[in-house]
Amino acid sequence: MLSHLIIGASGLYLGDMLFIGISFIVLMALISVVAWKPITKMMADRADKIANDIDSAQKSRQEASDLADQRRDALSHSRAEASEIVADAKKSGEKQRSSIVADAQNEATQYKQNARKDIEQERQDALKNVQSDVADISVAIATKIIKKQLDPEGQQALINSYIEGLGKHES
C-alpha cells in the first residue's frame, strides 16, 4: 500500500499542483483578510490596552505616592504648629503666672507698709494720750499738793485718792 502512494505521488500532474498552489494562495489571502488582520488588530488593541492600563496604574501609583507625601508633610507641619502653639501657651502662662505673683507680692508689700503706718499712727496716738494723761495727772497732783501741805498720812491718803481716781478715770 505504501508502494501505491509512492507510485501515485509520481503520477501527480502539473495541473493538480497548480490548482493546489492557487487554492493555497487564495486560502491564505482569505485567511489574511478575514482572520489574520482582525486577529492581529485585536492583539495590537489588547497590547495597547494593557500598555495603557500599566501606564495608568503607574500614574495612579505615583499620584498616590505624591498624595501620601503631601499628607505626611501636612501632618508634620500640623505637628510643628501644634508644638509651637503649646510652647506659646506655656510661655504666655508663665508670663501670666509671673505677673500674678509680682502683683501679689506688690500688694502684700503695700499691705505691710499700710499696716506699719497704721501701727505707727496708733503708737503715736497712744503716746500723745499717755503724755496728755500724765500731764493732767501731774497737774492734778501738783494742784492737790499745793493746796495742802502733806504729812505722811496725808501723802498716803493723796496717793490712795489718786489711785482711785485713776481707776475711775480709766473706766
UniProtKB/Swiss-Prot annotation:
Instruction: List, as start-end ranges, the regions of compositional bias called Basic and acidic residues.
Output: 56-97
Protein purpose: F(1)F(0) ATP synthase produces ATP from ADP in the presence of a proton or sodium gradient. F-type ATPases consist of two structural domains, F(1) containing the extramembraneous catalytic core and F(0) containing the membrane proton channel, linked together by a central stalk and a peripheral stalk. During catalysis, ATP synthesis in the catalytic domain of F(1) is coupled via a rotary mechanism of the central stalk subunits to proton translocation.
Which keywords annotate this record?
A: ATP synthesis, Cell membrane, CF(0), Hydrogen ion transport, Ion transport, Membrane, Transmembrane, Transmembrane helix, Transport
**Do you know which SUPFAM superfamilies this protein is assigned to?**
F1F0 ATP synthase subunit B, membrane domain (SSF81573)
Mode of membrane association: Single-pass membrane protein
| Gene label | atpF
Q: Which family does it belong to?
A: Belongs to the ATPase B chain family.
Q: Which organism is it from?
A: Lactiplantibacillus plantarum (strain ATCC BAA-793 / NCIMB 8826 / WCFS1)
Q: What is this protein called?
A: ATP synthase subunit b
